[in-house]
Amino acid sequence: MFALYTNTVSAHQLPLARELAARLGAENFRYVYETEPTGGNQETREREPWTMRADESGAAELLEDCEVLLAGGLRPTGLFERRVARGLKTLYQTERWFKPLGYLGSSPVPGSLRLLHPGYRRMARRFARLMESPSFQVLPIGPWAERDMKEVFRRFHAGAEFARALVPWGYYVAPGAAAARRVPSDGELKVLWVGRLLDWKRVDTVIDAVAKLRAGGDGLVSLTIVGDGPEKARLERRASRRGGAAVRFVPRVDIRRVRELMREHDIYVLASNAVEGWGAALSEAMEEGMVAFGTEEAGASAALLPEPRRFRSGDVAALARLIAGARGMAPSPMPPDFTAAGAAERMLAVAERMKGEPR
């Protein structure tokens, strides 16, 4: 039995889950989740026979005893330790452990300062020990997560480097969802941003870049911002001060409507600073045939976008140049192996190679 274990049924995990179920058979695969899905994923509970809540009968035993466990979005350290002690194959997909704690001016406050907290330090020490076992495999989501996990190991092994390879990971998409299209050579440029409105998402950069283009005479650029959050009122005021007619705010919508909006727009921007461990909406936008631009600091854009389509977080002028130069541009190419089908094949190969040895 193969189990995928996450905090909830997520649109970011479903493509991989479906591919694993197709290869293993529904009778040999379970997607176990902690909380009820939201945001357009609720129907999955009824449609997919291989999903189950963690508090359902038999779920706890399944997580303890399944041949292969792939966990993400949570850190069930005790479960991992019990499985590894029995030699059961356990894989852990993770975003950043050491996201910056904030910024002092333009300089990030090192996230490794979290290790000063006794509880966080104890947890990190336990994970560093888990990484010694051939029954435990880390799957870092994005380049910064890989760096963080290597740092966790070094901190508790007297500076020694982690010898085994970490397997780079991500949130994978189903291929072929959208027909090939280009950004229009003339007419309106429609820019889209989707997510939770938090300060480190740097949505202000996108607002300012669009305003800069319009102030410079390009009146055919518009921006749609989809989502809610504590920054919404501030961003609405900012957009209004900078010529709000070009910016439309849309409340949070379900994943089906997000995909529709992606097909209705031309350009997607991931503007986050280094606090963003990944940024799954970027890969979804690329799947829908959008031209995508993203920051050097966000995990998804660092992993998926070529350098000419990236900019430094907060660099309004650079983003404005990218948007202005997008007319006639082809969609951002998805790396050929970055599909759910390819990820499922790699996952099963990784699990097959792992050594199930009790510790």
Write out the residue ranges for each language-model feature.
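Conserved donor-binding/catalytic core segment of Leloir-type glycosyltransferases
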Residues: 139, 182-201, 207-210, 224
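A charged, aromatic-enriched C-terminal amphipathic alpha-helix characteristic of glycosyltransferases
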Residues: 328-359
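Membrane-proximal helix-turn-helix segments that form the acceptor-binding/catalytic region
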Residues: 113-139, 145-147, 151
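Nucleotide-activated donor-binding/catalytic signature segment of Leloir-type glycosyltransferases, i.e.
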Residues: 236-256
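Short alpha-helical donor nucleotide-sugar binding micro-motif in glycosyltransferases
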Residues: 252-253, 260-265
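Conserved acidic donor-binding segment of nucleotide-sugar-dependent glycosyltransferases
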Residues: 306-317, 324-328
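Short hydrophobic beta-strand element within catalytic cores of glycosyltransferases
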Residues: 291-294
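Short beta-strand->alpha-helix junction loop in the catalytic core
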Residues: 37, 144-145, 163-178, 230
